[in-house]
Structures are given as structure tokens and as C-alpha cells.
Amino acid sequence: MLEIKKLNVKYGQIHALHDVNLTVASGHIVSVVGANGAGKTTLMMTLAGLLTPSSGEVLYEGTALPKEAYKVLGRGICLVPERRRLYANLTVKENLLMGAYLRIDKACIQSDMERMYTLFPIMEQRLKQYAGTLSGGEQQMVAIARGLMSRPRLLLLDEPSLGLAPIMVENMFKAIREINCQGMTILLAEQNAFQALEMSDDAFVMETGRIIVSGTGKALLNDPVVKKAYLGI
């Protein structure tokens, strides 16, 4: 579904991504794990069309990925950004509807809203509440649901567990598994290496903008280098 070849991204003189090669198969959960500052968010923003690569190639379903963010979204790729980035002064319902703003199948939007309530039951109770007043875990639920409202085929999740209480982290990863079981392909950038690797079909470890290890999630969970550096084992 997604193939990244020798991707390089720079911020001025800072070389943020170095010859990144990565593939995402349709229907899989693929994780990119690494410490803060490893380049995970830069990768996700580049795939979403928010940053322009200096070189390299990104193919999505066999063709080059557009450079404009709205065209990337139109192709079926949606980024749920780090720290959620909700519209704090809009209600939960209004935030969800913002996720569907490019859709032309307006008649299906309400049924998709109801699907979000099934996935995140507490959301229906919060529809009229301003997003800025929600807890961190509730905000993350809304952010993911807003992304799903665009009906993507590839969902990019950037640090979905960041800043959440342990019980909310568990609930969040459970929801991600359920979304994947419904057919969604997911690329996940995450510092919580254990949870991410445990649920992933394939995974990549990133350090200072480079992919240093790759393999199945299960294989990386048992890799001595990964266990020592990222799992504290």
C-alpha cells in the first residue's frame, strides 16, 4: 500500500530524516518506534503532505504521493497528529464533522458518527461539550474519531498514548486494534515501544532520523538491542 524509498527531509541545515526506507502492507499495523526527537513526527508530517522531502520517493497504492496536504487526504491518508490538535472552542460533534469536510457522501456522515459512538461509547455523552474541556484520553478518542470521519484507507497515528494515564493508554491501544480489525491499515509512531511492538505486524526502530532495525513486531520484541534500548529489559 505504502512504499517509502530513500526519503530525506531537512529543516534548513538540519537533516531530519536520512534515507528512510519503509513499507506498509494493506491491512497491517506498522509501528515506527523511537525516542523523542528520533524523527517519527517528521516522517508522519511528510507523509501527510505537511512537510516537503528534499529527496526520495513515496508511493501510495502504486503512484507518487501528492505534495499538498488536502490532496493526500483526498487520496485516503489521514494524520491524527501528536498532542491531538483539536479545535478547543468547538464541541465534540463539531470536531467530528470537521473530519468529514472533504466528503461528498453527506448522507453517510450520520451513520459514521454513530459508528464512532460504538467505538468510543463515552463520546456520545460528550457531543455538546467543548473539546478543550475534555480529559486527555477523551481528547485522543475524539482526535482518532475525527480522523476516521474522513474515511481514510491509511490512518497515521502520531504518539496516540502521549500524556495519557496508564488505563487510558490500555484503552487507546485496544481501540487501535479494533479499528485495524475492521479493515483499517495503520501506521503508528510511538514512544511506548512495548505496546506498539506487541500489536504490530511489522515495525521499524528509528534513531536520529535513520531506520536502524526493522522486522515483525514479535521479532523486535525479542531483539536484544531493542529490548535493552527501548524496553528496559
Predicted regions and their residues:
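ABC-type ATPase nucleotide-binding domains, specifically the catalytic core motifs of the NBD
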Residues: 12, 92-111, 119-121, 215, ...
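The feature captures the beta-strand-to-loop junction immediately N-terminal to the Walker
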Residues: 33-35
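Helix-to-loop junction immediately C-terminal to a conserved catalytic motif
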Residues: 48
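Conserved ABC transporter NBD signature motif
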Residues: 56-64, 73-75, 108-113, 215
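Conserved ABC ATPase signature
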Residues: 130-134, 138
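ABC ATPase C-loop
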Residues: 147-148
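Conserved catalytic motifs of ABC-family nucleotide-binding domains
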Residues: 151
